[in-house]
Swiss-Prot record:
An individual GO BP term: prosthetic group biosynthetic process
Family, per entry: Belongs to the CitG/MdcB family.
Domain of life assignment: Bacteria
EC number: 2.4.2.52
Entry keyword set: ATP-binding, Nucleotide-binding, Transferase
PANTHER family given in the database record: 2-(5''-TRIPHOSPHORIBOSYL)-3'-DEPHOSPHOCOENZYME-A SYNTHASE (PTHR30201:SF2), TRIPHOSPHORIBOSYL-DEPHOSPHO-COA SYNTHASE (PTHR30201)
InterPro entries, sorted: CitG, TriPribosyl-deP-CoA_syn_CitG
GO molecular function: ATP binding; triphosphoribosyl-dephospho-CoA synthase activity
Protein name, as recorded: Probable 2-(5''-triphosphoribosyl)-3'-dephosphocoenzyme-A synthase
Amino acid sequence: MTKAVLTSISQLALKALLYEVSLSPKPGLVDRFDNGAHDDMSFMTFIDSMIALSPFFQAYIETGFAYAKEEQLLLFNRLRQLGQKAEETMFCATQGINTHKGLNFSMALLLGATGAYLARTPHLMTDLGCFSKEDTLAICRLVKPMTAHLIQADLGHLNTKKEFTYGEQLFVTYGIKGPRGEASEGFTTLTDHALPYFRQMISQNDPETSQLRLLVYLMSIVEDGNLIHRGGIEAWKGVKADMRLLLQQDLSTTDLRLALSSYNQCLINQHLSPGGAADLLALTFYFAFLEKLL
């Protein structure tokens, strides 16, 4: 019974990734229609990546459940070790293309936290589908003590390094903390912004329209390391401003699709991809499934 419940929830994480890549059109991003601003990956590359990561999603939630009473840092280390194996498997499946590195990191923590939370709230194991927004908040808050050390541990000694990953370079140049920062703050972009917005949208619109509007909203607020890496601070600010204007227009679904298709070509021409917003889109979908919003 326990394993079946954990399996079903881990499959919601996979489903969230499938929904994210399938949502179309998504400016600058891989979707059903085209590869966005990416020359090295396609819709099928994402499918390959998700299949490779799927067994690890199960391992993350089972680890959180099994070690719920363990000291938080020890649980984090277990999840990170699994996450590193998952990353290697992903790169093998994609021939070295980075499809889900940051999202895998976040999913490892959130699925681990979900497992730990379920171990402490056994009624959810027998009444699956009863997740509330308070449950979501509690799960995200569990990540905060697990990752409180992370910025200092991973990014605090970069002055001794000669070569940086692009995430490290963003921190050194702009102070952008990326997925580490989001995790160490308890995923407040999710709990305070993305999910409240989506709960409102889904109560007023059909699911796909709500998802497209959520993407636009995220692109208007997220500190997007992918955009900054590709185009710099000004390009990122420009995308945010454009998306704020698009939100203010309150377009019909048909006109919104047309606007996003047009903006897709704009971002392709600039080689810009809002990958940070895409990751948070997938994470929002995961909790939307838990809360039965979708």
